[in-house]
Amino acid sequence: KAGDFMANTPLDFLLKDSKATLIQLYVDGKTPLPTIPDHDVAIVAIGEADDSHPVLASLDAVLKTWPRPVLNRNVQAIIDLSRSVVSDLFVQSDLVIAPRTLRLSRQVLKQIATRQTALDPALSWPLLVRPVGSHAGNNLEKIADPEALTTYLSAFTHEQAYVASYVDYASADGQFRKYRIGLIGRKPYLSHLAISDHWMVHYLNAGMSDSQTKRDEEAEAMAHFDEGFALRHKAALAELCTQIDLDYFAIDCAETQDGKLLLFEADAAMIIHAMDEPDLFPYKGPQMKKLFGAFQALLEGALQPKTR
């Protein structure tokens, strides 16, 4: 669908150096589809967002009679990637820690801030509050108490927010480590590891370019991902793939202090790329080639006849 670069699955990046020809068809859920060019395989490449839900729902009937194999055919699974629904999927899980996330109106938040409404039992202070639809930490704040929430709301212009309890996931050295992982055909591939001394970790502000020590650790994590992180969390990652029934999606996650997988977000449109400076990040080229190769193999595999 039309939108910014985070609105859709980054197919241009995922098909880097492949021999595939990419035909992108933008849909809005209202305009009749044009004549579809001949193709070998299709993929639903729309990310979860409020304005995506009707578009995705409109595709369900169309895809039932699509003349070619379709990846991420389960449009309801994409719709269900909202932060609140994803947290509900794992509320009973012993393997995946997905802090319960509620979608609350500005009015309810004001009532919590003024103590007119009690905090939901699923939540506890400090809270993480972010506007619905926001990304990359925009307007995301850790709120210590009702007074801090009042201050936050004084500049809050949105109608709704996602609210979750904060989980301290600092490692023993005081650093916070956030992993971005692509789940491709139910197999995990590490896209990056960001390391920061701040709880709100984003790769671009984590100082990775400025620290050889951090880059060395990321290189080590990539080199030994399969027998390291992926093996430690094999059962948790399998549960993720079962609950989120998609051929391709990605997650941002960490490890809790007791060694469990802490899920921050799951999305089909998370940015995965190979644009980092190769002289500074020489280890990323082989890793991203492996990830992109897996995605391209997923497309090719969809063309193969299914065997019982």
Where do the protein language model's features map onto the residues?
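Short glycine-rich anion-binding loops that position phosphate/pyrophosphate groups of nucleotides
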Residues: 47-50, 132-134, 269
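C-terminal active-site "lid" helix and adjoining low-complexity regulatory extension at the edge
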Residues: 242-246, 255-308
